[in-house]
Amino acid sequence: MTNIRKTHPLLKIVNNAFIDLPAPSNISSWWNFGSLLGICLILQILTGLFLAMHYTADTTTAFSSVTHICRDVNYGWIIRYMHANGASMFFICLFMHVGRGLYYGSYTYMETWNIGVILLFATMATAFMGYVLPWGQMSFWGATVITNLLSAIPYIGTNLVEWIWGGFSVDKATLTRFFAFHFIFPFIIAALAMVHLLFLHETGSNNPTGISSDADKIPFHPYYTIKDILGALLLILALMTLVLFSPDLLGDPDNYTPANPLSTPPHIKPEWYFLFAYAILRSIPNKLGGVLALVLSILILILMPLLHTSKQRSMMFRPISQCLFWILVADLLTLTWIGGQPVEHPYIIIGQLASIMYFLLILVLMPVASTIENNLLKW
C-alpha cells in the first residue's frame, strides 16, 4: 500500500513541499532564512493575537491598555516584548534573505522574486502600522510624519492624506483603522508567502554556485528539516536573549511618553529597520523627490533581473561584484546609522553621499563590473 502522505490530498501537498521535495545538496546556511521568516510570521501572529485580546484601539485607552498588558496580564510583558522584538528578528531575517537573493542571483526566478518584493512592502507596511498602536509619542509623530509624505503627491496628495487619517489629523479614526489593518495584513502576508513557495517549487531552489543542481538532489527531509530546526533554535535563542535581558534595546524611550499632539519630540525617527530608507528620504531637500527616492530604494529590487549583465548567475566566482556587494552592505549600514542621527552637519552630507552611492552601486557600478568580469573570462 502506498504511504498515506503520498496519496492523501492535503498531506500530498505538505509532502511535496517539506518532505520529499528534491533540494540541492549544497545549499548553505544562507538558505535557512526562508524557514526562519515563516517561524517569525507564525510567532508574530500568535503573540499578536494574544495582545489583541487585551488591547483597546482607542486614543484615550490605547497607551493604558499596553501598560495594563505589561503589568496586569499573566505573562503579558513577555508576550508584548516577544512581539516587539520579534518584529526586529523578522526584519533581520528579511534583510539576510534578500541579501542572499542578491548575492547568489536568486532574482532570476522572476515570479518568486517579485512576490518576495511585494512581501517586503507588505511587511514594512504592517510593521509601521503596528508601531503606531501603543500610542506613545514616537507612535503618534511617526504616524503623522510618514502619512504626511503622501501629501507630496501632486493634485490628490492632501485629500489622500486626510482620507487615510479619517480626519484633519492623526486621531481616533486613524488608530482604529491602523489596528484593523495591522490585524489583517499578517494573514495576507501568510497567503502571499504560500504563493511565494508555490512559484519557488516550480523551479526548485537556487544554490551557491548558481549552476543547475538537477543532477545532484537530496530529499528535504531529513537533511534540511534538521538544518531548519537548528536555525530555528538559534533564532529563538537570539530572540529570547533580547526579550529577557534588554527588551528595550531597539525601542525608543519617547514611546514611554503618552502621545501628545501639542509637543513634538526633538528627533522623530522610525524603528531601526526603516532607518536606511528614512536616511534616503531625508537626504533630498525636495519633499516629492524624497518620497520618490524612498519608494525607489525598495522598488529598485524589482529591476534586479533587468540589471543582471553577468554570464554567471551567482557572485561566488565574481570577485569584483563581491567587493561591490559588500560595499553596498556597508553603505546600507551607514544609511541606517545616519537615519538615527539629527539633521545637522556632518550627518547631512554623509547621508547624501551614502544615498547617491546606494543608487550608483545598484544601477551603474554592479552592472558595469559584471560586464568587465565577462570580458575578463573571454567568454
UniProtKB/Swiss-Prot annotation:
It is found in: Mitochondrion inner membrane. The chain crosses the membrane at residues 33-53, 77-98, 113-133, 178-198, 226-246, 288-308, 320-340, 347-367. GO terms for molecular function: metal ion binding; ubiquinol-cytochrome-c reductase activity. Heme b b566 binds at H97, H196. InterPro entries: Cyt_b/b6_C, Cyt_b/b6_C_sf, Cyt_b/b6_N, Cytb/b6-like_sf, Cytochrome_b, Cytochrome_b_C_euk/bac, Cytochrome_b_N_euk/bac, Di-haem_cyt_TM. It is a multi-pass membrane protein. A ubiquinone binds at H201. One of its GO terms (cellular component) is respiratory chain complex III. Signal peptide: none annotated. Keywords: Electron transport, Heme, Iron, Membrane, Metal-binding, Mitochondrion, Mitochondrion inner membrane, Respiratory chain, Transmembrane, Transmembrane helix, Transport, Ubiquinone. PROSITE patterns: CYTB_CTER, CYTB_NTER. Pfam families: Cytochrom_B_C, Cytochrome_B. Component of the ubiquinol-cytochrome c reductase complex (complex III or cytochrome b-c1 complex) that is part of the mitochondrial respiratory chain. The b-c1 complex mediates electron transfer from ubiquinol to cytochrome c. Contributes to the generation of a proton gradient across the mitochondrial membrane that is then used for ATP synthesis. The cytochrome bc1 complex contains 11 subunits: 3 respiratory subunits (MT-CYB, CYC1 and UQCRFS1), 2 core proteins (UQCRC1 and UQCRC2) and 6 low-molecular weight proteins (UQCRH/QCR6, UQCRB/QCR7, UQCRQ/QCR8, UQCR10/QCR9, UQCR11/QCR10 and a cleavage product of UQCRFS1). This cytochrome bc1 complex then forms a dimer. Heme 1 (or BL or b562) is low-potential and absorbs at about 562 nm, and heme 2 (or BH or b566) is high-potential and absorbs at about 566 nm. PANTHER family: CYTOCHROME B. This is Cytochrome b. The lineage of its organism: Eukaryota, Metazoa, Chordata, Craniata, Vertebrata.
